[in-house]
Amino acid sequence: MAQDGRKSGGARFFSYFEGRKTREGVPTPHLMEELSSRKRDVPRWSQAFGPLGFTLVMVAMGAGSIYFGATVAGVLFCLIGVVPVAAVTLLVARALPRVFGAQRGGGEEELGPYLGGGGDGRVRAMCPGLFEQEREKIEWNRAEEADRTWRWLQALPCGVERVETTSDDGCRLVGRAIACRPESRRWLVFAHGYADNWRAGLTYARRYAELGCNLLLVDLRAHGESEGDWVGAGWLDRRDLVAWCRWVADRAGEDARVVLAGISMGAASAIMACGEDDLPEQVRACVADCAYDDFWDTAVGVVSSGSLGTPPMPAHPVLDIARLLLRLRRGGYDVASAKPLDAIARSGAPVLLVQGEDDRVVPAHMADALAAAAGGAAAGEGHELVKVPSAGHCCAVFADPDLYWEVVGAFVGAHS
């Protein structure tokens, strides 16, 4: 059952099956209710310097104790002040390059992380809250698409061309162009998620080609073959995607019609790119699948809940220290700047938000927040939201491919 309504600013939103309350006939609350009710976390630099203040106070107390003759107590105060903070800082510093540093793996699967041989494991990791029957349906659809995509690739009338461009800061970026629709002026620019590469776009390539799109599947900076020392969290990537859209406009001409799409971090990057003042006018539409609305708030939720399979841990001061260290590194930046919630109100193209209802990485309420931000701004007509039941992170396309491509096809057709 579809629900259709109007938001202020003229933007249209709709959500399919919003009234679903049961799974296999058993009443179940939304898996993400506890996160949707969590107060949004606001980054503060004071949180990063808090541990330093604690250390200084304890060392001062220790020095005072030693001065007045309480040597043992003074040493204990100093140890309590220095050791825990130093240990946490050291652990974060060692983990920082592993988490935010260049992610060069993920290229061994010819069909990418979702359609390749390890795709079943990836889907299960992304859909931990689903019943077995629901995961089996997703796996069936995934395997079916893998087979069809393989046959489609073998029959391509063109090759897969390695292409390059350069971002504003001189970072060399690499992608793969598939000009499978030479008669069409429509191009897809696709951005993958964290720790993946251009092959993640193969999950969607065949169906976008059927919609008349030539394809540009990019390696985000610090991923695949693209240069970059640090993962951009969407903030650095927004400028890279503007550069890629400009590349398409130069190649395909002024009458090119570009669809900018992405999943997860790539979706957030696409939204923020659409908010840039110099976005090429050829960009006619944006499809953002499971985009977070605020990277910092998402990271706090993931770290504190362990929703990616890691042990839950206190987000503060771990993330605060990581934020400070990354900002101080050469080529680093402030990860808290990555906030699609602010950018979507300035979008120069209509945005289709696709969201899995059972996403434990990017909770569904984030799509609602993005929809509200877009609908409340004078960003023009055409923004849409679709929620897909029984879909975990990046798995809406497998949970209900008919619904997914019905909505995406209509959106792409209407705006490009």
Residue ranges of predicted features:
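Conserved alpha/beta-hydrolase "acid-adjacent" motif
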Residues: 336, 360-366
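Short beta-strand/loop motif that positions the catalytic acidic residue
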Residues: 346-348, 353-355, 359
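Catalytic histidine-centered segment of alpha/beta-hydrolase-like enzymes
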Residues: 391-405
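Acidic catalytic loop of the alpha/beta-hydrolase fold
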Residues: 358-362, 394-395
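An N-terminal hydrophobic leader/cap segment in hydrolases
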Residues: 9-44, 80-165
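Hydrolase active-site cap/lid region
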Residues: 272-333, 342-343
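Conserved alpha/beta-hydrolase
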Residues: 205-227
